[in-house]
Structure formats: C-alpha cells, structure tokens
C-alpha cells in the first residue's frame, strides 16, 4: 500500500478520532475548572497535565471503546480489544500512576527536609500523576456520555 499525504489526511475525517479529540478537550477543560474551584487559582498547565479530576485517560479510552462499538459492532473483535485496553489504562491510572504520585510526595518531602542547605534537584517530582478510583469512574462516564452524544450528531 502506497502511503501518501492524501491517505494521511483521512485521519482528520476519522469520526472516532474527532470524537476522541473533542472529548479530550472537554475533559481537560472540566479538569481546569475543577482545579480552580478546589484550589481558588487558575493554572493553565492543568489543561495539559495528567492527574486530577476527572481522569482524561479514562474519558478518552472509554470514548474510543463506545465509538468503536457503534462503528464496528458490539460483538466485534476490535470492540473487545479496545475494551480490554481501556480497562488496562484505567487500572494503571488508579493503581501504578497513583502510587507514583504518592511516592513523589514522600520524595519531595525527604529532599526538602534532608537537603535544605544543598540543592540536589532543580524542581520537585511531579505529584499529581495518577487518579483516585472515583476520578477514573467519573472520567469513564464522561467518555461514554460524550461518545453517545457525538457519534449520532457528527455527520461527515
């Protein structure tokens, strides 16, 4: 198969990718507003950052799962694969990545306490990496809802 710019441009006509992109943008915007409500300050980097409420990883993965279900069928192998990968992504967000964030908090405290006189790092370890199970569930619901709303309403 010959790859060309014309074939590559079809990516921008892929309904699943467009819906996933819209879901990502919306979810990150929600995350930004929730951060403002809870912290009483704007931090535009939260729009691009990982971690926090709701989980964009969960929203994006479940959005893709549902749009694949609509497009390919709920009994398709592609749907089953997407669902399995989505569960892995969500388990990782609430498990390994969350633990990494908790460990980063401890390391930052240790470095601050024991190395007051001597700077050993230019910046702290990122602490807001993973998600609570609730953040993962909320993100998953947002992804499902967005897929259901957008799949039937985007026509191209």
What do these predicted ranges mean?
Residues 29-46:
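Membrane-interface helix-loop junction between the first two transmembrane segments
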Residues 6-7, 17, 41, 111:
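N-terminal start-of-chain detector that recognizes signal peptides
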Residues 25, 42-156:
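Membrane-embedded catalytic cores of phosphoryl/pyrophosphoryl-handling enzymes
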């Amino acid at each position: 198969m010959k790859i060309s710019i014309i074939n590559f441009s079809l990516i921008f006509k892929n309904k699943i990718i467009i819906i996933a992109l819209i879901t990502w943008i919306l979810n990150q915007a929600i995350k930004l507003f929730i951060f403002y409500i809870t912290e009483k300050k704007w931090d535009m980097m939260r729009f691009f950052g990982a971690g926090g409420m709701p989980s964009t990883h969960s929203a994006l993965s479940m959005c893709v799962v549902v749009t694949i279900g609509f497009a390919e069928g709920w009994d398709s192998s592609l749907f089953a694969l997407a669902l399995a990968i989505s569960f892995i992504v969500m388990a990782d967000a609430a498990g390994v990545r969350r633990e990494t964030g908790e460990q980063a908090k401890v390391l930052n405290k240790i470095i601050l306490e024991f190395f007051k006189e001597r700077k050993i790092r230019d910046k702290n370890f990122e602490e807001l990496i993973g998600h609570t199970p609730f953040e993962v569930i909320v993100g998953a619901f947002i992804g499902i809802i967005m897929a259901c709303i957008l799949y039937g309403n985007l026509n191209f």
